[in-house]
Amino acid sequence: MLTLTQGKKIVNALRSRLAFEYNGQLIKILSKNIMAVGSLRREEKMLNDVDLLIIVPEKKLLKYVLPNIRIKGLSFSVKVCGERKCVLFIEWEKKTYQLDLFTALAEEKPYAIFHFTGPVSYLIRIRAALKKKNYKLNQYGLFKNQTLVPLKITTERELIKELGFTYRVPKKRL
């Protein structure tokens, strides 16, 4: 367990330290492409882990980012890692914390932020309401009859509005 303040400190430190190896080169992940999600974004007082979403600029890079993740100046070990999710244990101020990393493409960003911010109970209610209208919502997009529904949105707030719901700041989602 860690406090919200500790979680924020870890995220701020990671913003300048995350990179991945690609074709023998170390590629820095831009701070603007790293965002806190999960309980940290909901500003819960106590956190089980730190969840970060990394926006990947090109689809071809997805398979390289997480499996080849590097954290400058921090000791870490990988528990499990794939193209879309990686669970690490990082050493921070003489303690070990779990860091969950997720990836999304730029066009998936609003959906991924919404999905990974949660909480699960809130997502279940939204998805149940959408299911009645034959829609499926996940971290990759909005689908109707298994077909992606193109929405001209760039933010989570626009997504919620487009779906016909009232936007709630993450802190107030139940």
UniProtKB/Swiss-Prot annotation:
Region (Involved in ssDNA binding): 42-51
Keywords carried by this UniProt record: Disulfide bond, DNA damage, DNA repair, DNA-binding, DNA-directed DNA polymerase, Magnesium, Metal-binding, Nucleotidyltransferase, Transferase, Virion
InterPro entries: DNA_pol-X_BS, DNA_Pol_thumb_sf, DNA_pol_X, NT_sf, PolB_thumb
Main location: virion
Further comment found in the protein's record: Consistent with its intracellular location, ASFV encodes its own replicative DNA polymerase and three base excision repair enzymes: a class II AP endonuclease, the repair polymerase Pol X, and an ATP-dependent DNA ligase.
Classification via Pfam families: DNA_pol_B_thumb (PF14791)
Binding-site residues, Mg(2+): D49, D51, D100
Disulphide linkage map: C81-C86
Record's function text: Error-prone polymerase lacking a proofreading 3'-5' exonuclease which catalyzes the gap-filling reaction during the DNA repair process. Specifically binds intermediates in the single-nucleotide base-excision repair process. Also catalyzes DNA polymerization with low nucleotide-insertion fidelity. Probably acts as a strategic DNA mutase, which gives rise to a rapid emergence of variants. Generates mismatched G-G pairs, in that case, the polymerase first binds the deoxynucleotide followed by mismatch formation.
Family stated for the protein in its record: Belongs to the DNA polymerase type-X family.
UniProt keyword annotation of Iron present: no
Domain of life: Viruses
Protein's name according to its UniProt entry: Repair DNA polymerase X
Gene Ontology BP, a term: double-strand break repair via nonhomologous end joining
EC top class named in words: transferase
Gene Ontology cellular component list: virion component
Location(s), subcellular: Virion
Gene3D superfamilies: Beta Polymerase, domain 2, DNA polymerase, thumb domain
Listed EC numbers: 2.7.7.7
Free-text remark on how the cofactor is bound: In the presence of magnesium, pol X shows a strong preference for the ssDNA gaps having one and two nucleotides.
Marked site: Stabilizes dGTP in a syn conformation to overcome the Watson-Crick base pairing constraint: H115
Swiss-Prot/TrEMBL domain comment: Small DNA polymerase formed from only a palm and a C-terminal subdomain. The total DNA-binding site of pol X is composed of two DNA-binding subsites.
GO molecular function: DNA binding; DNA-directed DNA polymerase activity; metal ion binding
Enzymatic reactions: DNA(n) + a 2'-deoxyribonucleoside 5'-triphosphate = DNA(n+1) + diphosphate
